[in-house]
Design a protein with these regions (language model features):
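Catalytic histidine-centered segment of alpha/beta-hydrolase-like enzymes
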Residues: 268-280
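Conserved hydrolase catalytic core segment
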Residues: 96-141
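Conserved loop-alpha-helix segment in the C-terminal half of the alpha/beta-hydrolase fold
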Residues: 229-271
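Active-site loop/oxyanion-hole signature of alpha/beta-hydrolase fold enzymes
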Residues: 12-17, 54, 64-100, 136-142, ...
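Conserved HGGG/HGGXW glycine-rich cap/lid loop of the alpha/beta-hydrolase fold
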Residues: 22-69
């Protein structure tokens, strides 16, 4: 079930836009920044963030640029723009911060830690080590990738947002994609991830322009090189159940873990891509053990 309402909901002016943050706990305590994945928003951490705050942290969940209530994107240079947003937000909140990040947010947390090691104490990466190598940019043909992204961007900006008749219909759509999420969570994510539409229905808040440099703006070897720069402790949480988005498994998962200098892996049985929603108790146990090992 979705957990406690945030204690505070604020906006910060960051990197020439307005970033929505949701806060739990005492602002004088060490900061843990929660970063969601693509098409999601900060309220996906309504169960996990208050539990982390109860351990003596200031838990801050962010709506990434182009998602939730935060400012929109002006182009598709999503990855690095959002990483810069998170870096500036971390400095404002009181770096170094701990980071809990899911999916795309997990990859961005690693990019952030590799580029700005002074900003990050540790990372809990929830199924966010990147997509399979075969869908990344081909280093031998980057021009084709650029052209494909531009063609896709043109289609996106020409297409009006789809308006859904109800939250229930939006939850149904998410349920077809995120097949393991409970119904109450599908409704929760739809309620906080949508806004009234022009014809009395609902539209998703996430701006699809963010997808034009996905699944990754980087080639495979460049991604590994970035991860090798991460010096802070990293806990990677993955599920063992088939899901739409948990696409890195087996030997490839082990290779990516071994490539990060101070990483450790915990499998959470019976979960898929949304480990922290499907099994928050096991997620918290793994986090507490990790923080007990590496420090607050």
């Amino acid at each position: 079930m979705p957990g406690h309402q945030p204690d505070r909901a604020l906006f910060y002016d960051v990197n020439r836009t307005s970033i929505r943050v949701w806060q739990w706990g005492d602002p004088s305590q060490p900061v843990v920044l929660f970063i969601h994945g693509g098409f999601d928003h900060g309220r996906m951490f309504d169960e996990l963030a208050p539990r982390v705050a109860a351990l003596g942290y200031h838990a801050v969940a962010v709506d990434a640029r182009g998602h939730g209530d935060s400012g929109r994107l002006t182009s598709g240079t999503t990855w690095l723009t959002q990483v810069l947003d998170f870096a500036l937000l971390a400095r404002h909140l009181g770096a170094p911060v701990g980071i809990v990040a899911h999916s795309m947010g997990g990859g961005q947390a690693l990019t952030l830690a590799g580029a700005f090691p002074d900003l990050v104490r540790w990372i809990v990466n929830i199924d966010g080590l990147g997509p399979p190598a075969e869908v990344m940019v081909d280093p031998d043909d980057p021009a084709t990738a650029m052209n494909e992204n531009l063609e896709r961007a043109l289609r996106i900006v020409r297409r009006p947002p789809r308006e859904w008749e109800s939250l229930e219909a939006m939850a149904d759509q998410r349920g077809r994609i995120n097949v393991r999420l409970p119904r109450e969570w599908l409704l929760h994510l739809a309620a906080h991830g949508s806004a009234p539409g022009p014809s009395g229905g609902r539209v998703w808040k996430s701006d699809p322009i963010f997808t034009i440099d996905l699944p990754s703006p980087f080639g495979y070897e460049q991604l590994l090189a970035q991860h090798r720069r991460v010096t802070c402790p990293v806990l990677v949480l993955t599920g063992d159940e088939p899901d739409t988005w948990n696409e890195v498994h087996g030997d490839e998962l082990q290779r990516r873990i071994a490539n990060i200098p101070d990483a450790r892996l915990v499998h959470v049985p019976g979960t898929g891509h949304y480990v922290h929603i499907e099994d928050p108790d096991s997620t918290m146990r793994a986090m507490e053990a990790f923080v007990g090992e590496v420090g607050p």
